[in-house]
Amino acid sequence: MHFFYDNRRLLAGVLLSAVLLSGCAPKNNSQGSDQSSADVSTSENNPGGDVSQPDGSSVTANGSASLPEDGSQQAAYDFSKPCPESPAVDNSYFADAAFIGDSRTEGLMLYSGIGEVDKYTSIGISIFKLESKKAITIDGVDYTLVEALAQKQYNKVYICLGVNELGYFNDQGFYDSYCQVIDDIKASQPNAVIYIQNLIPLNEDTIAARGGSEYLTNEHLRVYNELTQKVAQEKQVVYLDLYSAFVGEDGQLPADASTDGVHLSGAYYKAWLEYLKTHTVSYETLYPEGGAAE
């Protein structure tokens, strides 16, 4: 069993190299085998003015950056790197935001103190099923998460998916599906800042102690984080590095952060929100020419 699993890890590394070299392929309808991925989304844990910048620009209370007072052009935003830290915004920043995700995002909505925010979440959802699983009901009509999102316009869209996908061992499919979803979000939300949140680490010791699935590893999770960073660079959307903010010295989620090794405790959901509030960027900063790249 362990020999077979180690070979899966080796294969994952080989596939990652191929994916990073290939870039986004045309829309890929292969979604991996459902038999290889169990649902990991059931949790038992759920417990004003402008700020001047050194270059003369300013950041308003809602986190929007303006050009320097002398009218000079700011350096182009570097989509290949994680979003840099910015002055903290308050919860009102998220009033025109939508959050897409699985049960981890559901926990963020419930336990972080973010307030009333539009969420498009579903327990057990994966990037492979985002365009096919009718998980959202609006006025008695069932929609996929992508279809439901198109019913309203937002200025920010946050997406965080990948834990339920770890068992598929389909890295190219994960990458291609993520690219397609970002394209779909851009099409339905042309004026939104899109934030891809990478995956917060797992605590493998806790998962093992609770008899959790062997495929839930930080090694494969880091592969997915590399892939989502590449998606952000290629599609020119914002990449948020939650992993680095939460990983412990041993390369895992701290033991006190989760009772099942996957979902967070209340204090850590609050820390997640604080990270989001200190990593924001305006649409104008990202796309000074007035339109997001395709």
Segments the model singles out, each with a brief description of its role:
Residues 87-177:
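Conserved SGNH/GDSL esterase-like catalytic core that processes O-acyl groups on lipids
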Residues 98-99, 156-160, 193-198, 238-241:
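Structural recognition of the beta-strand scaffold that forms the well-ordered cores
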Residues 3-11:
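Bacterial N-terminal signal peptides that target proteins for export
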Residues 27-96:
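N-terminal, intrinsically disordered, polar/charged segments of Gram-positive cell-envelope systems
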